[in-house]
Amino acid sequence: LDLAEKTAESRDRALCILETLICWYRDLLIWLESGETGFLYNPDRSEEIRREAGSYDARRLVTIIEAIGAAKNKIEANANTRLVLEALFLRLAGLVAPV
């Protein structure tokens, strides 16, 4: 929750971090489903993506991406950034644990 407080200090920074997280988990999903690097946002991190993707199933990755996207939308709609991030991080704590 300290991370939520620090990140919430700048709304724009929070949105940037959330977009980065969406891209990361999207890359994990793309790799998991296709094994291809051509569609990755971060092809230079393909080895790390390959290793990390093995810890998730597709359904969990979609849920994570949707949760982050929903939080991003709330912040863009002027919801309290800190509260949105705290709720997101608590939700993600149960989702990003290894399968």
Question: Predicted regions span which residues?
Answer:
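AAA+ P-loop NTPase domains with strong preference for DNA replication initiators
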Residues: 1-59, 66-99
